[in-house]
């Protein structure tokens, strides 16, 4: 009972009025049904870390799954919050899902208090949302959500590589820590990207099982190219891929590396349109490099020079 009261107080302290459309980047934190008090405390701690980080970053925060006196189910509330989010196109939206998941070989579900939500249903709800999105599903059996929600505008993270990985997932604990962990900052730019946090969390998850002498039963994946396939941390050494994609295109990770919850000082000073243009140029350079073997050398070098000059001029004009 005491835990429930404390959770309600925390939820009320961050809950925004969903009837007001926020013009700021938004984070929706969904806390699923815990089942037992042990998981309730764990999920609460993970959620609190995300909430604290989002507030530090100045995000508009909405929490689903903590109200003790709600007049609607968590499923209804989640849909209402998503409907509201659709009214602010173009602004970053984070969706963090903390809890348990299930998979019956046909459909994956995220367990809520009351009726659950399936991957297919969530995909339908998100169709009107024209915003860059980062969706982090920390539940077991969460991989089918990556397939269902994949889109070029979205970065998707799941605790598991398949719906069959249904044991309790610990990835969420390490992800909630890594998102603001300076030791995860592999490129030393004084900010931890979503990609860097994913790599750190996935490796810490593997270390937990190894130290405990247990078989690794969860393999986190990240998709940011929109193909719904995703990559695992063991396909990279640091930020560098050690495998190639079958189609010759860059592996996932570039777009996720452009997502930062808490930005460094220089990035905070950049207008949104400048950051978006910079990210677009970086994407174009990466895609061009993947085509190096298929283009005439002169054409490749000419295109690369043009993009690099444009990026340098943009950074110089922004004072970087």
Q: How would you label these PLM feature ranges?
A:
Residues 21, 37-48, 69-76, 112-120, ...:
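Soluble non-cytosolic domains of exported or imported proteins
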Residues 82-114, 129-170:
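Active-site microenvironments of hydrolase-like enzyme catalytic domains
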Residues 13-94, 101-110, 116, 134, ...:
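Boundary/activation segment at the start of structured domains
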Residues 32-35, 44, 48-60, 83-90, ...:
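Sec-exported extracytoplasmic/periplasmic mature domains
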Residues 2-4, 13-28, 40, 214-320:
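Disordered regulatory segments flanking catalytic cores
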Residues 118-129:
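Catalytic-core regions built around general acid/base machinery
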Residues 48, 134-233:
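Active-site-proximal C-terminal subdomain of hydrolase catalytic domains
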């Amino acid at each position: 009972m005491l835990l429930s009261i404390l959770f309600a107080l925390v939820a009320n302290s961050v809950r925004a009025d969903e009837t007001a459309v926020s013009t700021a980047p938004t984070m929706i934190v969904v806390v699923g049904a815990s089942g037992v008090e042990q998981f309730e405390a764990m999920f609460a701690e993970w959620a609190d870390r995300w909430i604290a980080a989002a507030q530090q970053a100045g995000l508009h925060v909405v929490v689903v799954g903590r109200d003790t006196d709600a007049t609607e189910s968590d499923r209804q509330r989640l849909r209402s919050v998503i409907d509201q989010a659709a009214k602010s196109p173009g602004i970053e939206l984070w969706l963090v899902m903390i809890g348990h998941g299930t998979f019956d070989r046909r459909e994956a579900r995220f367990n809520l208090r009351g009726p659950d939500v399936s991957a297919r249903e969530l995909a339908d709800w998100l169709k009107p949302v024209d915003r860059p999105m980062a969706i982090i599903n920390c539940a077991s059996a969460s991989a089918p959500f990556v397939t269902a929600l994949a889109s070029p505008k979205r970065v998707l993270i799941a605790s598991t590589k398949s719906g069959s990985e249904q044991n309790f997932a610990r990835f969420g604990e390490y992800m909630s820590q890594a998102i603001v962990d300076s030791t995860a900052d592999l490129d030393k730019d004084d900010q931890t990207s979503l990609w860097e946090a994913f790599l750190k969390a996935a490796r810490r998850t593997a270390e937990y099982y190894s130290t405990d002498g247990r078989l690794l039963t969860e393999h986190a994946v990240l998709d940011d190219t929109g193909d719904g396939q995703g990559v695992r941390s063991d396909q990279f050494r640091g930020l560098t891929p050690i495998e190639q994609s079958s189609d010759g295109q860059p592996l996932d990770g570039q777009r996720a590396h452009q997502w930062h919850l808490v930005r460094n000082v220089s990035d905070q000073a950049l207008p949104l349109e400048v950051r978006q243009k910079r990210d677009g140029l970086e994407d174009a350079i990466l895609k061009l490099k993947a085509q190096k073997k298929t283009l005439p050398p002169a054409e490749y070098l000419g295109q690369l020079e043009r993009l690099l000059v444009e990026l340098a001029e943009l950074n110089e004009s922004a004072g970087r």
